[in-house]
Amino acid sequence: MEKDVVSLEDALEHGLTKEEFQKIQEILGRIPNSTELGIFSAMWSEHCSYKNSILKLKTLPTTSDKLLAKAGEENAGAMDIGDGLAVVFKIESHNHPTAVEPYQGAATGVGGIMRDIFTMGARPIVSLNSLRFGNPDEPKNKYLLSRAVKGIGDYGNSLGIAVSGGELFIDECFSKNPLVNAMTVGIVRHDQMASATTGGQIGNSVYIVGATTGRDGIHGASFASKDLSKESESKRSAVQVGDPFMEKLLMEASLEAIQKGLLVGIQDMGAAGISCATSEMSAKGKTGMKIDLDLVPFRETGMNAYEAMLSESQERMLVVPKKGKESELVSIFEKWNLNAVKIGEVTADGMIEIYMGGKLKAKIPAESLVLGGGAPRYERETKRPSYLDAVKTWKPDEIPDVTKGANSKEILLKILSSWNVCSRKPITEQYDSEVGLVKLIGPGLDGGLSAIPGTNKALATATDCNSRYTYLDPYKGAEFAVCEAARNVYVTGATPYGVTNNLNFANPYIPENYYIFSECIRGMGDACRFLGLPVTGGNVSFYNESPEGPIFPTPTIGMVGILENKEKLIFNFPKEIGVELAVLGNFRPSLGGSEYLKKIHGQINGSIPELDIKEELELCKLILSLNESRILKSAKDLSLGGIAVALSKTVLFSGLGIESDLTSLRRNRLDLTLFGESSTAVLVGFDSLSKEDIRKQTEAYGLKFYPIGKTNSSGILEIKDAEIKISFQELSGPYEKGLEAVFAL
């Protein structure tokens, strides 16, 4: 056993509290040494233990007869999709690393979430990303955004995994603290799913496989569990360095070993590295492990036990093979030119014992380290922020309606050029969306749709959150995020299936921040419960703030859906002339929190769009029912930018013209009609012969039918009541150029 002991000051420097340090001493029956303190600090960090969020997360709905893995019990969520197949999916953040080293920070975020998926035995088929950055007109923000996107593209493209969608949201609050949330979805046969456990197999060998271990990423978990500060720039050593080509080899070798039935368990070495993998696998299998660090393949000389246990070097796995299968395991990894080295064995006493240089460096009960075991759990003080009441006093009559007359056209073009509305092509062109030949509906639209190889099914995917909405109304904003993600799935024709979430918030020790977090959890939970969607897992990222202030609360929703027959997909936009257009649902536009209010009037204020969760469910049922009858030519979610932006995008993506009359949608202000944002509204296209049938079905679901126009061959958008008449070319200029300068070489 190491002779050194640590002090309370050491514990505080490691991010632990006085009470936590006392609890560690009670668990061990003594004062920990430096290696043990490092292990506890990483495993009890917010990033690994969810200590300030787990009690709230347990209120989310997590039950479904389709669930194959309980939330939080495996590396990712898994749901039965029929035919003996499961969809495996998860979203995770890499926010702080991206803030200090955007290329590697974003790239390794992609690599980490990929490993979570193929560690379950699933082959990743698509990925998505949800990004939040500050104004790209500022050089630092432009650098962060452009480098992060390149990191995401380079890593994902090298792995050969298609990008099916994602989102980008720009606001000044993300200038010093960008958000990078990466989601991956894979497919696996039920009988080939793997688990992160020792399986209770006492005496089995423990192998480290994949890349060598270096000093990169040490304290990565702790770094992600603190506020960003001026000193954060010096924490580049806490940012992991990725090698996507190594990851590709690791993926193929791991999947081969799983499919050949060689493994008892397998765990990605992500946050906290060997510390996390050994303790989580042991705790789940109700065993311990004895590990000899001298056997670990190192890439750097002179590494000590503290560094080895906390290294977050990428592209590594911890594996427990079945007895008698060890040599076959090694052969597979050698074939892929990867390390597969025995470093220990499974023990019966429940202890993690770490040796180096022939000496015992750490001895800790596995259960004491893990989420749901001995890791601390807190519910923090809450206080409703005063601004939440202040913003609700704002009324639209405080701003002029600047859309009257010829101004409508000018305003529309400004909104089309805004960071949050303009074309994502400069981003999506850096991602390979064609690899794997699975794309049916690609990135840049409402939701992605991808063929599931070997079946007639398709997988719908979406990520959504309007951070302004959750800032203005945490509860309703989170509800809205769930409903919009569901809408973006079902407008492809797919049935929403399950949710993964990435909860990006500020310091939880500040009562106002914890109130916002709690309300977002409550809103998300209520929406998921009513829509019948289980939350299969996800990620919490606290401490997203800088000396300039906190980010807007961003509970990113990752949604998956299944289309049983991929021939029944619905496109976002019509492809023929003479297609009738109508809005289905309940059009209740609001200027509160809208892109129009921010872009044109420079304000973030007001009440967000009204949402009736019952109507949202009925609208989902309606769209899916109409699609079964094959009478829809197109379906598009109506939200950011309002009806004027939706019609503009229809012209831009279809190349057709539209003659529209918004009388059925008209409100007392023209700007509210054109640019007000609404929940529970979908813009659909259909043949004129189906018009009355669709109207009757819509009304039968208790919803409203708003006819607004028809497509033609002119390539011109005409909105009669707004005196708008704009050609494809006029629309295309500002829309396409919005992000071009950010990514110009």
UniProtKB/Swiss-Prot annotation:
Residues that hold ATP according to the record: Y50, K90, N501, G538
The protein's role, per its UniProt record: Part of the phosphoribosylformylglycinamidine synthase complex involved in the purines biosynthetic pathway. Catalyzes the ATP-dependent conversion of formylglycinamide ribonucleotide (FGAR) and glutamine to yield formylglycinamidine ribonucleotide (FGAM) and glutamate. The FGAM synthase complex is composed of three subunits. PurQ produces an ammonia molecule by converting glutamine to glutamate. PurL transfers the ammonia molecule to FGAR to form FGAM in an ATP-dependent manner.
Organism listed in the record: Leptospira interrogans serogroup Icterohaemorrhagiae serovar Lai (strain 56601)
Keywords per UniProt: ATP-binding, Cytoplasm, Ligase, Magnesium, Metal-binding, Nucleotide-binding, Purine biosynthesis
Subcellular location: Cytoplasm
Disulfide links within the chain: none
Chief localization: cytoplasm
The organism's taxonomic lineage, starting at the top: Bacteria, Pseudomonadati, Spirochaetota, Spirochaetia, Leptospirales
Protein name: Phosphoribosylformylglycinamidine synthase subunit PurL
Sequence positions that bind Mg(2+) 2: D116, D268
Binding residues for substrate: S93, H94, N95, H96, R115, Q240, E312, S313, Q314, S541
Binding residues annotated for Mg(2+) 1, in chain numbering: E92, N539
EC number(s) stated in the UniProt entry for this protein: 6.3.5.3
GO BP field: 'de novo' IMP biosynthetic process; purine nucleotide biosynthetic process
Oligomeric and partner information: Monomer. Part of the FGAM synthase complex composed of 1 PurL, 1 PurQ and 2 PurS subunits.
Active-site feature positions: H47, H94
GO MF annotation, one: phosphoribosylformylglycinamidine synthase activity
A single Gene Ontology CC term: cytoplasm
Gene behind the chain: purL
